[in-house]
């Protein structure tokens, strides 16, 4: 990540640092010598080791709390990864996290005394929906063909509307919104990836939709790239190519279970209760119509994908086979606040060669 426009080192705030994406983005920034400060904010303990990130656990994302953090740390860039894109993680929290949380963050970023000059927001292709009237590939200027029907889609659309209003009201802040395709990765768990890793995967009778993916590592790289280039606007992020669900299932070694297309949610209840697969309401239209996004705008900023959609699928399938052969890797990391404080600030902790000395 290059320094700021005036040559100063970057100071960054990562929201959702306790989540899968926030933790990995914070780790990536920690390794960048041009980043002076990384602040992580989350409601729960981090799930990955953070060596240089100053993590603050907040029980709420109220304006007063976020405002105090932004002013006290003097951050110039915010990476908002805390937006929920999976309703199975808690549908009752969607509005509070996606809408109210985003509103409070934007209010703090635009308040008097704020030093924020750049904002990167992680969003989702869910904002486009999936219908029979969709174009082959959505561009960023297109809108969805029908109103949002699921709570998660409505919350994402509301959050993006708030971000657009903020960008108009704060022209001195560079605002970038990244809409990601469905993500596949060895470490990531989503309704679709869980289904593909199980013996049975739901489908809709008579439909074989084309799917576009993005590999988990490319997601982190895209967010870092967006911070580095500081280009305003909305960008679709999805790997090149699309492939039919039947091919995806064959690569992953799962058997498709066709459900009636007009009562899929009802007929899936016995399967979901048994844990055979997940079928949240936002996944049903995707299994019928698929979704494609035109990613030319983001590629023109200089971003290169390491995986195509097909390559991401094969890499995910290899991870599934490895997991079935050797089991899940042991989760060794557990955040301990007192230990983290000691390791960062105690005089008795030696500084390793090549590391900056701690200010005492």
Spans of model-derived segments:
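NAD(P)H-binding glycine-rich loop region in Rossmannoid oxidoreductase-like domains
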Residues: 58-100, 130
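Mid/C-terminal beta-alpha module of Rossmann-like enzyme folds, strongest
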Residues: 220-281, 295, 308, 315-317, ...
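Active-site Tyr-X1-5-Lys
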Residues: 148-176
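NAD(P)-dependent short-chain dehydrogenase/reductase
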Residues: 166-216
């Amino acid at each position: 990540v290059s320094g700021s426009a005036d040559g100063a080192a970057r100071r960054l705030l990562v929201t959702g640092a306790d989540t899968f994406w926030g933790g990995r983005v914070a780790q990536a920034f920690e390794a960048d010598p041009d980043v002076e400060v990384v602040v992580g904010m989350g409601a729960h303990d981090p799930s990955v080791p953070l060596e240089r990130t100053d993590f603050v656990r907040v029980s709420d994302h109220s304006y007063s709390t976020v405002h105090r953090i932004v002013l006290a740390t003097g951050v110039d860039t915010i990476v908002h990864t805390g937006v929920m894109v999976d309703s199975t993680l808690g549908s009752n929290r969607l509005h509070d996290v996606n809408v109210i949380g985003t509103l409070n963050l934007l209010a703090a970023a635009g308040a008097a005394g704020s030093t924020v000059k750049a904002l990167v927001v992680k969003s989702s292709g869910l904002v486009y929906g999936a219908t029979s009237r969709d174009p082959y590939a959505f561009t960023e200027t297109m809108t969805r063909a029908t109103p949002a029907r699921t709570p998660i889609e409505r919350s994402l659309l509301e959050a993006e509307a708030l971000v657009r209003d903020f960008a108009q009201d704060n022209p001195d802040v560079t605002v970038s919104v990244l809409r990601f395709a469905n993500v596949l990765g060895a470490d990531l768990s989503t309704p679709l990836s869980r289904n593909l890793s199980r013996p049975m995967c739901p489908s809709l009778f008579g439909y074989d939709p084309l799917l576009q993916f993005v590999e988990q590592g490319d997601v982190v790289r895209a967010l870092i790239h967006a911070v580095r280039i500081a280009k305003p606007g909305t960008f679709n992020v999805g790997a090149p190519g699309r492939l039919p669900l039947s091919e995806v299932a064959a690569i992953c070694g799962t058997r498709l279970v066709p459900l009636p297309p007009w009562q899929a949610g009802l007929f899936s209840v016995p399967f979901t209760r048994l844990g055979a697969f997940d079928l949240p309401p936002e996944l049903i239209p995707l299994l019928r119509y698929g979704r494609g996004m035109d990613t030319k705008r983001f590629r023109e900023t200089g971003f290169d994908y390491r995986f195509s959609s097909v390559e991401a699928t094969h890499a995910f399938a290899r991870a599934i086979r490895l997991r079935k052969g050797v089991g899940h890797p042991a989760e060794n990391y557990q955040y301990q606040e007192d230990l983290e404080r000691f390791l960062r600030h105690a005089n008795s902790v030696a500084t390793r060669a090549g590391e900056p000395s701690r200010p005492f």
